[in-house]
């Protein structure tokens, strides 16, 4: 028993050490995770309606969300976020190589709506969710859920299990029509939350002048481009990380901000919205009673008409 405990402790220590080493060695990869955006913004949706993910994912792409037209209180339902893209394309990874696109999404629900507890999620919804792991944007914002990055080929459609509020126990919610907002991205961003650029964007010349040298870094990849400034003859060196492809050559004259590389980005970010009605069960019952009364009234009207016709026929025979 003691040996088993020691083995489990050693296994956990190795895993934690590996994760820590990964974060320290490849910061550009760790920066892709939502936690870094969470640390920078108290609310992911600005007053203008813009979702802050667009600050890092600069290209605009479509996204869609599907929800039921209406739901009853204290009910689990599914919200489906669709993040379409060409499955054949490859993105530039942090090490400069090509790989599959990842996706992520952030639905912003009305106050009171939240991620459904695991024991409340129906089996058919669990099967659609797969191995996805969701988390709240912050402890005090349970109505904002985030997921990603996850493999896009498997999760271009993400199913979120949502629990509707019950106004009987939650006084902040009411039987109304509510908006739901969503942001979704495919591929890596162009700018990290700290303002630095990733290798998944265009790199531009920092000065006007002549390219006098292009040095390719064989070990780490990327380029050092030496530009002789036209204004004073001084030399500046622009660093291009591995990933983007050069579109300039030695001897070429450049203007400041002229692209040095292509744009390797094949992904992008999009926003969408939908509406959902938190339906009052009593209202539905009242509506059913109304329909029943209309049907009964029609039946009685038909019976009364037939009775009247019989009376008329009897009088004519008399």
From Swiss-Prot:
Keywords: Chloroplast, Electron transport, Heme, Iron, Membrane, Metal-binding, Photosynthesis, Plastid, Signal, Thylakoid, Transmembrane, Transmembrane helix, Transport. It is a single-pass membrane protein. The 4 large subunits of the cytochrome b6-f complex are cytochrome b6, subunit IV (17 kDa polypeptide, petD), cytochrome f and the Rieske protein, while the 4 small subunits are PetG, PetL, PetM and PetN. The complex functions as a dimer. Belongs to the cytochrome f family. GO terms for biological process: photosynthesis. Heme binds at residues 33, 53, 56-57. This is Cytochrome f. Binds 1 heme group covalently. PANTHER family: CYTOCHROME F (PTHR33288:SF10), PTHR33288. Its cofactor is heme. InterPro entries: Cyt-f_TM, Cyt_f, Cyt_f_lg_dom, Cyt_f_lg_dom_sf, Rudment_hybrid_motif. Component of the cytochrome b6-f complex, which mediates electron transfer between photosystem II (PSII) and photosystem I (PSI), cyclic electron flow around PSI, and state transitions. It is found in: Plastid, Chloroplast thylakoid membrane.
């Amino acid at each position: 028993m003691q040996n088993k405990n020691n083995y489990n402790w050693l296994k956990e220590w190795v895993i934690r050490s590996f994760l820590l080493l990964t974060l320290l060695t490849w910061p550009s990869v760790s920066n892709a995770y939502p936690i870094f955006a969470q640390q920078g913004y108290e609310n992911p949706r600005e007053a203008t309606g813009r979702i802050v993910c667009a600050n890092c994912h600069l290209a605009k792409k479509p996204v869609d969300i599907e929800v039921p037209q209406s739901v009853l209180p204290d009910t689990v339902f599914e919200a489906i976020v669709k993040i379409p893209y060409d499955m054949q394309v490859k993105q530039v990874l942090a090490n400069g190589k090509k790989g599959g696109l990842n996706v992520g999404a952030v639905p912003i629900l009305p106050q009171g709506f939240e991620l459904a507890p695991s024991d409340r999620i129906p089996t058919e919804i669990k099967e659609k969710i797969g191995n996805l792991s969701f988390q709240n944007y912050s402890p005090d914002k349970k109505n904002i859920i985030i997921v990603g990055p996850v493999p896009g080929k498997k999760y271009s459609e993400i199913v979120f299990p949502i629990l509707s509020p019950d106004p009987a126990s939650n006084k902040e919610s009411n039987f109304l029509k509510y908006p739901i907002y969503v942001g979704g991205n495919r591929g890596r961003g162009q700018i990290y939350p700290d303002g630095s650029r990733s290798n998944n964007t265009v790199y531009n010349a920092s000065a006007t002048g002549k390219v006098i040298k292009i040095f390719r870094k064989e070990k780490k990849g990327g380029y050092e481009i030496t530009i002789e400034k036209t204004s004073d003859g001084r030399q500046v060196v622009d660093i291009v990380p591995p990933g983007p492809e050069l579109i300039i050559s030695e001897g070429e004259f450049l203007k400041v901000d002229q692209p040095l590389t292509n744009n390797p980005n094949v992904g992008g970010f999009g926003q969408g919205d939908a509406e959902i009605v938190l339906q009052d069960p009593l209202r539905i019952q009242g509506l059913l009673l109304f329909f029943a009364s209309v049907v009964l009234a029609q039946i009685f009207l038909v019976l009364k008409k037939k009775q009247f016709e019989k009376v008329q026929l009897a009088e004519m025979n008399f």
